[in-house]
Amino acid sequence: MFARLARANYLKNSGRYFSTEPTLKERLVQIIPGKIEQVKQLKTEHGDKIIGTCTVAQAYGGMRSVKSLVTETSSLDPEEGIRFRGLTIPECQEKLPKAPGGAEPLPEGILWLLLTGEVPTESQVKTLSKDLAKRAGLPKHVTSMIKAFPEQMHPMSQLAAAILALQGESKFVKAYNDGVKKDKYWESTLEDSLDVIAKLPEVAALIYQNTYKKSDITHKIDENLDWSANFNRMLGYTSKDFDELMRLYLTIHTDHEGGNVSAHTTHLVGSALSDSYLSLSAGMCGLAGPLHGLANQEVLSWTMKLQEKLGNKEVSNEVLSEAIWEGLNAGRVVPGFGHAVLRKTDPRYTCQREFALKHLPQDPLFKLVSQIYEVVPDILTKHGKTKNPYPNVDAHSGCLLQYYGLKEHNFYTVLFGVSRAIGVLSSLVWDRILGHPIERPKSVTTEWISSYVNSDQSKK
């Protein structure tokens, strides 16, 4: 009897709420030995096997498609799109737990999935959600710093700086300084990662309120609300449909394998044993670039300018095509189309389109986005300068956020960053679990390449 009472008390105090199912950390403890053994066997028995090569064009072309990174959390197929631990987006929408009465997956569920490779139960997601709520809350120096930022400072710069300012909270740094064993690095990295994921919605919401509303956050974290709903309330939004959109948005933007700039940067910085805060802040600086996360705000700006150019009215496909050709012939691109890896329509675009068809089918901006989807692939194919003429995730997200009243385009990448933290930090935890070493590829000069390609060695 006393053992049962002690167990119940432990569950309550640890955020388990009397659930008999394993917590996230307990499940990882169960999974880790088998995974470590699998990797050890692969390195021992097949360590000399070649899994990829690098051409001169790839060396000068951003190392595109060079197989040189190991990422456990997701994989990207050129034809099929992203799979999160083997699950497609439609499968995640079907299998991951949802909010009561909701239809979209909870981001807490994909956090569990990315970390464990398993679909969590509703109880496990609820427990994780409450745990994140308990971890939320910002130190005074961070809130003061955000409120002191100048209005013209880009929200992504504010986000990266705020994450750095939280670094004094790092449990990994303390454990490392206390001499923790290497095989236990992952535990404090997990703690740091959950802490920063829990705090990011408040960081982002404070940036939003301070920059655009000249206000403060009035909502206090409610343990009975999920991570996305609490985020929306802190932003100042109460629409249940917008809650659903935010759950979808924060789920589908979490991860896109390990080679993209934000994921690779987080991994690279983390490989030096930098903690979750330092690593994520660096990743967010990469996400802020126009060729990465900043693209979503650029797409919406382009679409709205096009809408204005067309007279804010519906036009024929022929008229729309002429306007798009005019831009292409002037040397401008069509933002939101094409992808470094994908060769089909991005499934992240498709699920957002399905959401819009259900919730805002008559919205003028959505109708224009749909019409662009109809005409642009054929135009880009004829233009002949892109390998993938189909829309990516950025082509749709802006019009959905705009519809629900979140119209500050410069803030959109911050939402992307809040979501992407889930994926890149899950990967960082696994980097620690598997003991990945510091990343140190070999670089060569143009002179070396010129000499090599003309040598006998290159002809072997």
Curated annotation (Swiss-Prot):
Compartment(s): Mitochondrion matrix
Top EC class for this record: transferase
CDD domains cross-referenced by the UniProt entry: ScCit1-2_like
Active site: H292, H339, D394
Keyword match Oxidoreductase: no
Pfam families named among the record's database cross-references: Citrate_synt
Catalysed conversion reaction: oxaloacetate + acetyl-CoA + H2O = citrate + CoA + H(+)
GO CC terms in record: mitochondrial matrix; phagocytic vesicle
Enzyme Commission number: 2.3.3.16
Stored InterPro entries: Citrate_synth-like_lrg_a-sub (IPR016142), Citrate_synth-like_sm_a-sub (IPR016143), Citrate_synthase (IPR002020), Citrate_synthase_AS (IPR019810), Citrate_synthase_euk (IPR010109), Citrate_synthase_sf (IPR036969)
GO biological processes: carbohydrate metabolic process; citrate metabolic process; tricarboxylic acid cycle
Gene Ontology MF: a single term: citrate (Si)-synthase activity
This protein's pathway: Carbohydrate metabolism; tricarboxylic acid cycle; isocitrate from oxaloacetate: step 1/2
Domain of life: Eukaryota
Transit peptide stretch: 1-25
Keyword Transcription on entry: no
Keywords carried by this UniProt record: Mitochondrion, Transferase, Transit peptide, Tricarboxylic acid cycle
Family: Belongs to the citrate synthase family.
Miscellaneous comment text of the record: Citrate synthase is found in nearly all cells capable of oxidative metabolism.
Cited PANTHER family: CITRATE SYNTHASE, CITRATE SYNTHASE, MITOCHONDRIAL
Protein name from the UniProt record: Citrate synthase, mitochondrial
Gene field: cs
